Regions:
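Conserved SAM-binding motif I beta-strand of class I
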Residues: 45-50
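Conserved class I S-adenosyl-L-methionine
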Residues: 20-29
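S-adenosyl-L-methionine
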Residues: 1-20, 35, 53, 57-87
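Class I S-adenosyl-L-methionine
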Residues: 2-6, 91-92, 101-170
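Glycine-rich helix-loop-beta junction characteristic of Rossmann-like nucleotide cofactor-binding loops
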Residues: 12-19, 83-87, 112
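Conserved SAM-binding loop of SAM-dependent methyltransferases across substrates and taxa
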Residues: 30-43
């Protein structure tokens, strides 16, 4: 991995990942986040999912370069198709750097795989309201969030948990 310095945005996303989580990083983009989390001892196992072959190959190369192929599995797959709930044990999912509409679509398309997942850490670049509406409609509770500025952009990080529905606001 050429650049060992994680962006402030991804560092903040990583701080929400529970200790010893089994992580699926959707749209992993070079596996910077899972590599950082394994190297710092926050997690021991991760899946880095990529849907496009070029970024997938870069992700594979970075994981191999870091010597973490036993701890980080790189998979060429669309969204939540990158993991199997019954065998992979994923309990935390990160999706960062995409639009809120796309993140909601990824979650909707893989909704049947979310039953064992306890934590979603989502960082939409836009469409935050749409994503929040999807989370509320599917009985996810937002337990934490953070807004940060980096490179003249404002980013929002949303942490949500399933099955903890609260009264809806009108």
């Amino acid at each position: 991995m050429k650049n060992e310095k994680l962006s402030q945005r991804l560092t903040q996303v990583g701080e929400f990942v529970p200790q010893d989580a089994i992580l699926l990083d959707v749209g992993s983009d070079h596996a910077y986040l899972p590599i950082h989390l394994v190297k710092t001892g926050r997690i021991n196992k991760a899946i880095a999912g990529e849907v496009v072959k070029g970024p997938y190959e870069s992700t594979v190369a970075n994981v191999q370069s870091a010597g973490l192929q036993d701890q980080i599995s790189v998979r060429l797959a669309n969204g939540l198709a990158a993991f199997e709930p019954t065998t992979d044990g994923v309990n935390t999912i990160t999706i960062a750097g995409m639009g809120g509409h796309l993140i909601a679509e990824i979650l909707e398309d893989g909704r049947d795989k979310l039953c064992q997942v306890s934590t979603l850490i989502l960082q939409p670049n836009n469409g935050e309201r749409h994503l929040r509406t999807w989370l509320q409609a599917h009985d996810f509770t937002i337990s934490d969030e953070k807004i940060l500025a980096e490179n003249d952009k404002i980013y929002e990080i949303i942490v949500a948990h399933p099955g903890q529905s609260v009264d809806r606001l009108t």
